[in-house]
């Protein structure tokens, strides 16, 4: 069964190796992956008004920030950040990417996703030991596609311990997808938000 479309390449490969190799004595660390459905739930969540109190914007995109404030969901605000971006204007792209990353980092993670992370991390603690360290990495479905490769351009976090830290690092993994704006031409998916699962 190919799960790449829902958990990305890294997540699918880790699951396959654990299932096939653990039984024959090859040590493969267990883990879990938040799916594209979790990513969708996060970006479709409403943005609390107070979120914007911690988000500034460079002068060259102040109007863009004001337009994004009127959006009800994270996804729609992010699409405003990306829309009509000029891939040749690197300074403007950098400002847009910075605004998008700040927005993701400040938007609360839905309670349902927090619960899933807590439950899955608890299973790893039972399997290994309490407070076990994990790596939080992107497993994006678009990292290595037929027309683009973003491998190594998203953030990875090592030695992460505790459910709260995992939640924060997952959110930062999501935010890091907007660092790749500078490497894409034209703007990523023409302003549409791609799917990013993440693995721990």
Regions found by a protein language model. Name each.
Residues 187-190, 194-200:
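Positively charged, low-complexity/disordered segments
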Residues 1-185, 189:
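N-terminal beta-alpha lobe that positions the nucleotide/phosphoryl donor
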């Amino acid at each position: 069964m190919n799960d790449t479309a829902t958990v990305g390449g890294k997540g699918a490969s880790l699951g396959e190796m654990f299932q096939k190799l653990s039984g024959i004595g090859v040590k493969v660390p267990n883990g879990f992956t938040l799916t594209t459905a979790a990513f969708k739930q996060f970006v479709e969540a409403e943005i609390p008004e107070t979120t914007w109190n911690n988000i500034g914007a460079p002068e060259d995109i102040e109007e863009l920030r004001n337009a994004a404030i009127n959006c009800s969901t994270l996804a729609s605000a992010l699409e405003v950040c990306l829309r009509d971006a000029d891939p040749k204007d690197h300074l403007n792209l950098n400002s847009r990417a910075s605004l998008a990353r700040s927005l993701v980092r400040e938007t609360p993670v839905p309670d349902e996703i927090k619960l899933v992370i807590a439950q899955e991390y608890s299973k790893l603690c039972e399997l290994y030991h309490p407070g076990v360290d994990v790596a939080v990495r992107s497993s994006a479905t678009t990292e290595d596609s037929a027309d683009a490769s973003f491998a190594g351009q998203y953030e990875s976090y090592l030695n992460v311990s505790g459910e709260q830290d995992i939640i924060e690092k997952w959110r930062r993994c999501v935010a890091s997808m907007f660092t790749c704006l500078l490497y894409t031409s034209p703007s990523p998916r023409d302003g549409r938000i791609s799917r990013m699962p993440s693995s721990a």
